[in-house]
Design a protein with these regions (language model features):
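Register position in tetratricopeptide repeats
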Residues: 43-44, 77-78, 111-112, 144-145, ...
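Terminal, low-structured helical/coil segments at or just beyond the last alpha-helical repeat
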Residues: 22-23, 177-255
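N-terminal leader/linker segments that initiate helical-solenoid repeat arrays
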Residues: 17-66, 252-255
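TPR alpha-solenoid repeat register
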Residues: 67, 101, 134-135, 167-168, ...
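Residue-level recognition of tetratricopeptide repeat
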Residues: 64, 98, 131-132, 165, ...
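Canonical positions in the second alpha-helix
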Residues: 56-57, 90-91, 124-125, 158, ...
Length: 255
């Protein structure tokens, strides 16, 4: 299965964290030299300087403020996941139910190759939000470490959620990038999990549902085509020498 780029929710997260920081800032904080540098850096897109300014500010004023949340978010934007994890985890000690911090911590754990810990976070997050995006991310991680029954349970829960046409996602196929409906992405992973549990007909049906939603969804089309190839070969197998075809996710694809 090709890696899905989980960016749209993060863009919303970044906007919400920054806007919340702006609303929560006191007049004294706005006049602080480090915050002035931070604001100037953000206005010019200089995230490196923004990080330095916030570190100086937090060093002086302490971490019990929303600028620490913003620092975690900027570290995530920069791909500095260990630093993002540090600050999101630290802030969750003070705000254990903050969904933005939970999301940043979970994604950081995944990027740091700690999928089990990331799954624990996203299970709690999805229970709070019932967000289709969080459902997809949880399924993706569950499938990645072959927690297939859990992945299917999450998929079944996600089917009860409301999906809107604007719920979309991007994905990579080799050097190319595609775009599809979030629900199609959920159907695709659901199909892979079912197929890997030897529920091949059900898995195929979910690939077909994904393609029905978006006929240009390359990953689902590849998986569906792989199943047809496997089925064709299975029909030609000598009954005295049966084979056990693998998952379509393991078939060679474009890289």
């Amino acid at each position: 299965m090709k890696k899905i780029v989980f960016v749209l929710l993060m863009l919303g997260l970044c906007t919400s964290v920054i806007s919340q920081t702006t609303k929560d800032v006191s007049g004294a904080a706005k006049s602080n030299t480090h915050i002035k540098v931070f604001n100037q850096a953000m206005n010019t897109g200089d995230l490196g300087t923004a990080i330095i300014a916030l570190n100086y500010y937090i060093s002086d004023q302490g971490s019990n403020n929303t600028y620490a949340d913003t620092l975690a978010m900027i570290y995530m934007q920069q791909g500095a996941y260990a630093q993002c994890y540090y600050w999101s985890d630290k802030r969750l000690a003070a705000k254990p139910d903050d969904k933005s911090l939970m999301e940043m911590k979970g994604i950081s754990l995944e990027k740091m190759r700690q999928p089990k810990e990331a799954i624990d976070i996203f299970e709690k997050l999805y229970a709070k939000t019932k967000s289709p995006y969080h459902a997809y991310k949880l399924m993706e991680m569950q499938y990645s470490i072959k927690r297939l029954a859990e992945c299917i349970a999450t998929a079944n829960s996600a089917e009860k959620l409301q999906f809107k046409p604007e719920y979309v996602m991007t994905y990579n196929v080799g050097d190319e990038m595609g775009r599809t409906y979030l629900q199609a992405g959920i159907f695709n992973i659901h199909g892979l999990a079912l197929y890997d549990l030897d529920r091949k007909a059900e898995g195929k049906a979910y690939f077909e549902r994904a393609v029905a939603l978006d006929s240009n969804f390359v990953l689902a089309r590849q998986n569906l085509e792989a199943i047809k190839v496997i089925e064709g070969k299975a029909n030609k197998v000598d009954p005295n020498n049966p084979q056990n075809p693998g998952s379509p996710a393991n078939k060679p694809k474009q890289n």
